[in-house]
Amino acid sequence: MSTQTLIYCVGAAKAGTSWLFDYLYNHPETYFPTVKELNYWNSVALGAGEFYRGELARRKGEIAARHAVTRDEDIHAYQLQSMADIEEWLVTFDGKTRDDKAYLGFIGAGLRDAKLVGDFSPGYALLGPEWFAEMAKSHENVKFLYLLREPVDRLWSHFRMNAGGDEAAATSMVDGYLSGGEENVARRSNYRRTVKRLMQAVPQDRLHVELYERLFTEEALEKMCDFLGIEVIPADFGKRVHGSPEAGLDPARRARLQSALKPQYNFIERYMGAVPVEWQERMVAA
């Protein structure tokens, strides 16, 4: 068998990572635990382990509640596996003690039948280059993936998710961001910083950057699978995975967000040679 690849998808949040994880989870040449967003490296690096352990415990409770009323046998089985995987991960990693061997074992590194294993944790986008370098050394064949979405759309989707469908609350978060608040979401919107840090630590041929707006196409999927070293299988491009509740963003706020995010547009223009046409189509006159 060819050398197994370990893929780290470092985000961005609300840029298609859940859809891609679902596609790869169901791929016959891969192995992934059901737990997306293990947050191992940022727990060790940033001391955020207790928060993420709490999030996983909460997620397990939500799955248990759905499991109690589920009648579909396939969904029932997946829910059982999800709860078991969460419990195993909470036992494997205490949220603070670095144990790369145990972590790699949990994600399937070394499994004979898996050409691809990995970890999809958008929180890794906040890490420094020294930690990307550590991740790159964790396995003999490590690659990195970073998905980018039109900056205002990504930010708005993130606020809608945080607001749980409350459009007024999401709009208030936008206003807070424009006033210099919402620091966590702001940091996750900094494509320039994350790409630069990745480029400091990761060889160019080990990094694949793709646009959310192009992800759901045969062409993008073929490039992705070629990079990952697996065959392309049919995809459900219409499947919605963890999408944010629908809500509109008024043109005035969109224009102000575009202005606030201008450094990101400028960087991507330099990095990709032009602002993607899909992004230009979403922009409004300031």
Could you tell me what each predicted segment is?
Residues 1-102, 106-111, 120-121, 174, ...:
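PAPS-dependent sulfotransferase catalytic core
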Residues 100-104, 132, 195-196, 265:
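Generic structural signal for well-ordered alpha-helices
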